[in-house]
Curated annotation (Swiss-Prot):
It comes from the Bacteria. One of its GO terms (molecular function) is magnesium ion binding. Mg(2+) binds at S102, D239, D241, D243. This is Phosphoglucosamine mutase. GO terms for biological process: carbohydrate metabolic process; peptidoglycan biosynthetic process; UDP-N-acetylglucosamine biosynthetic process. The keyword Metal-binding applies. Catalyzes the conversion of glucosamine-6-phosphate to glucosamine-1-phosphate. Binds 1 Mg(2+) ion per subunit. Its cofactor is Mg(2+). InterPro entries: A-D-PHexomutase_a/b/a-I, A-D-PHexomutase_a/b/a-I/II/III, A-D-PHexomutase_a/b/a-II, A-D-PHexomutase_a/b/a-III, A-D-PHexomutase_C, A-D-PHexomutase_C_sf, A-D-PHexomutase_CS, Alpha-D-phosphohexomutase_SF. The active site is at S102. It catalyses: alpha-D-glucosamine 1-phosphate = D-glucosamine 6-phosphate.
């Protein structure tokens, strides 16, 4: 069996790859690894979930694993992933667990684990947890068994935390927020209204089955239409667990994570809040971001794909802003992981501060045409390293020279290779990406 942990926890189709038995074993293993060195007294883990149908089943299984190892489960209910990360620190818990598959379709689910303070685990800690899966070890009895506690104040605590993200009132701004029928549904509209914005919420009625269904950050058509119809100043789209945020301007044009990072980096540098005048992003960020930051005198640090690697670089360099093109934006002063609602509040704060429409702010970066093709493969390692694929990549890179770039990346959560090409013209990017994707497909 391959490694359980991917780039963002353990994922799979609920009740197929991600079974209740596996969830119980992961809960027990996490308890043994992360709570073993705790100070004397009750050991506590925060646990939350998004609203997809399988969440309650997996939550019950994880709780069984936690409590079987003597760890109390502090249940916060349906809340965003960044809320669980924040509350892990706020409640001074030993660790936290979030049950969500983020932007993935409803049949999928996942288990993310946060260490003390709400930080994502490093690879070594994940490996040690994985080694304990299926090895229950000694189990407590009687009063030593963990208890289940409902955290009634969890949502209010998180909302108070969110209020720190907006440093001035947002009165006069109208925003459409797409909650993806996910974990943001109950809290994002409240947070934006509390900051003063006029809020029109769409796709905010989760029933367990409709999460991410033609809505949210991966399907922007309904958001674009609503922004134009309501003559809103902007639209914000969250995914199923609200750890990411994408935006559209008043005309419905996409403002992706790269543009959001540029807007926030310039704002933070102006305020003296951009530590070391440095932005941290991943290899997937558009070359246009690098050019915009270079012209502004801002250094860009690049990491592998995944917000956990962005966070690791932020912590290592004591930097203050990082993120991904997909809309995971991390500001350590406001949270230990990406928070889509914090991002939305900061973006609107910049609009209110400058009086500028989002389209003007986003124009600080010019996007180079980019083509991304996902190729399903049986073996990611074999397909990516096949000689025919390497030849195709080399030929494409030679043709681009320094006018663009090509990136071949195995997905961390799905059986596919992502082929990304940026070029001066869209047709060039499409032609080269298609050529490389065909080579990958033939080698799979």
């Amino acid at each position: 069996m391959g490694r359980l942990f991917g780039t963002d926890g353990v994922r799979g189709v609920a009740n197929r790859e991600l079974t209740a038995e596996l969830a119980l074993a992961l809960g027990a293993a996490a308890a043994r690894q992360l709570a073993s060195g705790s100070a004397p007294g009750r050991r506590v883990a925060v646990i939350g979930r998004d609203p997809r149908a399988s969440g309650e089943m997996l939550e019950a299984a994880v709780i069984a694993g936690l409590t079987s190892q003597g760890v109390d489960a502090l249940r916060v209910g349906v809340l965003p992933t960044p809320a669980v990360a924040y509350l892990t620190g706020a409640y001074d818990a030993d660790f936290g667990v979030m049950i969500s598959a983020s932007h993935n379709p409803m049949p999928d689910n996942g288990i993310k684990i946060f260490g003390p303070g709400g930080h994502k685990l490093d690879d070594g800690t994940e490996d040690r947890i994985e080694a304990l899966v299926g090895d229950a070890g000694p189990r407590p009895v009687g009063a030593g068994i963990g208890r289940v506690i409902d955290a009634e104040d969890a949502a209010d605590r998180y909302l108070r935390h969110l209020s720190k993200a907006s440093t001035l009132r947002l009165d006069g701004l109208t925003v459409v927020v797409d909650c993806a029928h996910g974990a943001a549904s109950a809290v994002a509209p409240r947070a934006y209204r509390a900051a003063g914005a006029r809020v029109i919420a769409i796709n905010a009625d989760p029933n367990g089955l409709n999460i991410n269904d033609n809505c949210g950050s991966t399907h922007l058509d309904s958001l674009r239409a609503a922004v134009v119809a309501h003559r809103a100043d902007l639209g914000l789209a969250h995914d199923g667990d609200a750890d990411r945020c994408l935006a559209v301007d008043a005309d419905g044009n996409l403002v992706d994570g790269d543009h959001i990072m540029v807007v926030l980096a310039l704002a933070m540098r102006e305020a003296g809040e951009l530590a070391s005048d440095t932005l941290v992003t991943t290899v997937m960020s558009n070359l246009g971001l690098h050019l915009a930051m270079r012209s502004a005198g801002i250094t860009v640090r690049t990491t592998g794909v995944g917000d956990r690697y962005v966070v690791e670089e932020l912590r290592a360099g004591d930097f203050s802003l990082g993120g991904e093109q997909s809309g995971h934006i991390v500001m350590p002063a406001l949270g230990s992981t990406g928070d889509g609602i914090v991002t939305g509040l900061r973006l609107m704060t910049r609009m209110a501060q400058t009086g500028s429409p989002l389209s003007d702010l986003a124009s600080a970066m010019q996007t180079l045409p980019q083509v991304l093709i996902n190729v399903t493969v049986a073996d990611k390692a074999t397909a990516a390293t096949a000689p025919s694929v390497q030849t195709a990549v080399g030929q494409a890179a030679a043709e681009l020279g320094d006018t663009g770039r090509i990136l071949l990346r195995p997905s961390g959560t799905e059986p596919m290779i992502r082929v990304m090409v940026e070029a001066p013209e869209k047709d060039i990017a499409q032609r080269l990406a298609t050529r490389v994707a065909e080579a990958v497909s033939a080698a799979r």
